Amino acid sequence: MYHPRELYPSLGTGYRLGPPQPGADSSFPPALAEGYRYPDLDTPKLDCFLSGIEAAPRTLAAPPPLPPLPPALGTEPSPPSAPEGLHSLPGVSLSLENRELWKEFNSVGTEMIITKAGRRMFPACRVSVTGLDPEARYLFLLDVVPVDGARYRWQGRRWEPSGKAEPRLPDRVYIHPDSPATGAHWMRQPVSFHRVKLTNSTLDPHGHLILHSMHKYQPRIHLVRAAQLCSQHWGGVASFRFPETTFISVTAYQNPRITQLKIAANPFAKGFRENGRNCKRERDARVKRKLRGPEPAATAGYGSGDAPGGPCDSTLGGDVRESDPEQAPVPGLPLPQLLPAVAPVLRPTCCTLPLSTGPPVTFQPGIPASRRLQTLPSALLSRLPGAAARASRLRIPSSSTLSILCLALPPRGPLPTALPWAWGLPRCGLQTNVLSLCSLPPGLLPPHFHYPFPHTK
């Protein structure tokens, strides 16, 4: 970079970049130079730029203190030893009503089922409280906390630690439905927490207590004195734990002895009893009823070419047994003589035969026979060989829709084409071969029946 006086010597040596200094070698008179002097530019000053910055650094103020929570709800769980409680409510005591039942389960190793939808605890926590102010209002709360930091597994007929516990889930507190209530209300009768439900769904929207499977937990019961549920001023809190209430959360019972105890002690465990709803005999009967299933409801006012659905709309499944050769139906027998022969090996369902007039009525297997059946019409019985002797055995619905039995044949059995009334009948598209006996020989039908029937293909 070149200085201007080097580029333009004609300007002389008095040319300066800065303001002229008084008394210096300058082409300006001293009085004029003093008038054009800028004292503020002699020494740079940055005070104007730093005037907003204080010398001492600022310190951020502390946030306002939050209202303290009850001390029992914020403490970490400790190993249970004896019924313990905080003494901020002096004179208050809590006793476990069903202590003997809990001790019986605890001696074996209590297990609690947890499901996605939530499962109630059994035994449930049932306590009695004394020492409350009859006029003051209290809240009863229950939460479940882990006992230790281990995960368990059932091995060798006992529970053993099998690693580190999973991260603790968000704590949830169950509030008794009667809360808040007066002390006289709580002391009048035992307080039961039988509605508490345990779940393993972390996204549970119903407020159930969320637990990990194969972890050991213990319920805690809190008694809070407060005017209302959302009050920030707590009048006192007392927490209680009982060592016999520890349990291991499972998705299925691991110890057979626990299953037996639950069956014997739980009045709602009828599903496991021999005479209960889920005993083998009842389960088999329910499965058979479901496999048969009710016939789909017929639509009213169908046309001449439309007909209600028949047994092809249902599925018999694999419950139909293969028939033995000696139990196979004898070809050539009339219908009244054939039905008793095939009853032991063939499973009856139903199909509908619409009549010429009248609205269709669906055959309902669940209705007692005394209310929905009547004997065959005399016009039909007179055309059946030997029908007079078996008229009381074969009955049909008392409606304008005639339900004839459909015979479920064994899966590998051929169609009995030797039967004259089975000619031209197709198989239904079921898992088993079903022969729809929806047509009878023309000589056996009364004149007022439709023939052929619309819903046969």
Curated annotation (Swiss-Prot):
SMART domains, per the entry: TBOX
Organism superkingdom: Eukaryota
Region (Disordered): 1-31, 60-90, 272-334
Start-end of Pro residues biased regions: 62-82
A biological process term (GO) from this entry: positive regulation of DNA-templated transcription
InterPro entries noted in UniProt: p53-like_TF_DNA-bd_sf, T-box_DNA-bd, T-box_sf, TF_Brachyury, TF_T-box, TF_T-box_CS
Keyword 4Fe-4S in annotation: no
Keywords assigned: Developmental protein, DNA-binding, Nucleus, Transcription, Transcription regulation
One cellular-component annotation, GO: chromatin
GO molecular function, one term: DNA-binding transcription factor activity, RNA polymerase II-specific
Protein name: T-box transcription factor TBX6
